[in-house]
């Protein structure tokens, strides 16, 4: 991602053409195009300020520490929450990207002891309710349909998630995970430094698979916002 991807995102969100943006910012369309593609080594501060002002962006832009957490959250559990809280405390902005795949998710349900299948809206609602008071957290849903499960699908998945993050204007400095085997893959395929949180499950010895297999045995690891989903099925 170039350093001006956030400007590309702002232009798309504003719904303007490059010519309209260039005219409003006092530059030619060619100059703007080169700027956005990092072809201009020392861009004019005056032009940059005008561009940011037109798009409603802060200038000069403060460098933020941005983190990302990937997961299915099928279902959300206290291990996820511990990971997210730790990550959230280390960055200015944290993006939670929830992956979903109708075929895979259906199979997870059929192989589980759950009485009903969590939907994508269910999983998003759990995240939104759990972190509603943390203003530096952003939550997204990413369609992984047709992407082969890792470890075989890293190339396809990484290309898909790169495009998704560029579209959303997400340029993370850090990835946070509890999965030791994922860390080198994130570094290799996404080129983003990865931080491991509680990989040995010392603080939260729980997994989504355990809860799917026996929700009531691991009841204490199911968050308050998620418990009503299971209670309804009794």
Segments from the language model and where they lie:
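Helix-turn-helix/winged-helix DNA-binding modules
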Residues: 13, 40-43, 203
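Nucleotidyltransferase catalytic core that binds NTPs
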Residues: 60-234
């Amino acid at each position: 991602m170039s350093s001006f991807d956030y400007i590309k995102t702002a232009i798309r969100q504003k719904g303007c053409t490059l010519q309209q943006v260039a005219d409003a910012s006092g530059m030619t369309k060619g100059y703007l195009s080169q700027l956005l593609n990092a072809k201009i080594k020392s861009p004019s501060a005056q032009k940059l300020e005008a561009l940011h002002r037109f798009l409603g962006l802060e200038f000069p832009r403060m460098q933020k520490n941005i983190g990302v957490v990937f997961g299915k959250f099928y279902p959300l559990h206290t291990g996820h929450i511990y990971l997210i809280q730790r990550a959230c405390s280390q960055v200015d902005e944290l993006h939670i990207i929830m992956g979903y795949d109708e075929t895979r998710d259906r199979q997870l349900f059929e192989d589980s002891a759950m009485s009903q299948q969590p939907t994508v809206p269910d999983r998003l609602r759990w995240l939104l309710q759990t972190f509603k008071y943390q203003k530096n957290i952003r939550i997204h849903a990413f369609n992984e349909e047709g992407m082969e499960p890792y470890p075989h699908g890293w190339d396809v998945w990484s290309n898909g998630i790169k495009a998704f993050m560029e579209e959303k204007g997400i340029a993370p400095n850090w990835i946070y995970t509890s999965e030791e085997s994922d860390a080198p893959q994130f570094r290799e395929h996404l080129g983003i430094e990865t931080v491991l949180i509680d990989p040995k499950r010392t603080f939260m010895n729980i997994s989504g698979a355990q809860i799917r297999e026996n929700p009531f045995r691991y009841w204490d690891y199911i968050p308050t916002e998620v418990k009503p989903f299971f209670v309804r099925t009794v």
